[in-house]
Amino acid sequence: TLDRSSAASDVYKRQVQGWFCIELCSKEVTVMNKEYLIYKLSDEVKNSCKIDKDAFTKFNVKRGLRNEDGSGVLVGLTNIGNVVGYERDENGKLKPTEGKLYYRGYELDDLVTPLLKEKRFGFEEVAFLLLSGQLPDKEELEAFKELLNDNMPLDHRTITHIIELEGSNIMNILARCVLEMYTFDPNPDDISRDNLMRQSVELIAKFPTIIAYAYNIYRHSVQGRSLHIRHPRENLSIAENFLYMMKHENYSELDARMLDLLLIIQAEHGGGNNSTFTVRVTSSTRTDTYSSIAAGIGSLKGPLHGGANIKVINMFHHLKEAIKDWTNVNELDIYLKRMLNKEAYDKTGLIYGIGHAVYTLSDPRAVELKRLAGELAKEKGREDEYNFLKLIEQEGIKCLQEHRGGSKPACANLDFYSGFIYEMIGLPQEIYTPIFAMARIVGWTAHRIEELNFEGRRIIRPAYKNILGELDYTPLGER
């Protein structure tokens, strides 16, 4: 067994070289096997990829496309979403403020509150708004719902493809199915507005079905459970149809309405979030819709973007075991400080679900989800857990600010309550991030349409400065 740790890399190198070294005419000839060659290439990267942190300051590099004060570098304009987390004072400095999120000029709370009061589903209405820029009237909304429902069933070839994949990662299956849709599209490369809108509606409609089928097949092939493939039903909302395809009729009306609201809250978040920006960057090249959306899925799959809610719910389960008294603030504070000092839990120094790149005093999505989580916890008999989660939020923010020296405010983000809601609805962790994609496909397609239709558009092409310098070439025989 070879030790491949970085600390023992020299030992590993000698082991491999020794095993594959032969004596020939008093001359050692090293035969590099493929495994060692991969190691050697990887080892060289340690130096070739090293860039001094001071160089970023020297050349005024906007790392992560962020300014020195933490605000995002302005790279584009949009009419779709607006993320507000701070204001600027008279000197241009950032001033923390309560967070707000706008969809096509409408504040998120103004869209969500009527749905709660009227106890109706609204994801389709919000999708219409984000795609078109206008709120639908009753007739338009009913026609749009029918259009989405008509497009939910999958081509039999796509179903066969999902069955053949039997993958353990639903996001990868989703991306591959999206790319496969290119093959079945009669006009896949057409970027006219009509065709873009048709493709967008079809993607929004098919994402729930792909995800539900992919999970059920994963559940069968990997977990050995019974295989159930349920076709979407007419006259059900997207949220209801998704739960039906996942769980048959084993869900409540409140479960479906909570999922519907979760989809609304995650549908859009401006043009600068990583996955939406990825879609806009790829769209600026005029590539096809399916390639662009698959790239967005790849971005969202990353644990720093779409996978954080799983980290929050796992941390929550750990804290439920680690803290004996869920009402003891002092006991919780001590443990959270140990986490920040990398002494407890996964020793990353993080309290998952606390902090955001833009929001300062509050994340409006987390505010809405906190309200929804409380309503659902009451129905499910999980109010003690909900109250403990609220206490973790309260003390986590306080401990993080103390740890930072009080210089920067922090708040709970979208991921803090979303995983708990998914769990109460009875949805497995394997589809937490895919559900995020099921919601965000609306924002992605809206931004793609906008990127390809505003005046003066250009391919997005930022600059990278090379700091290596020139080298003299050495002939192969002299190396």
Language-model region placement:
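Non-transmembrane, aqueous-exposed alpha-helical and coiled segments at domain scale
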Residues: 31-479
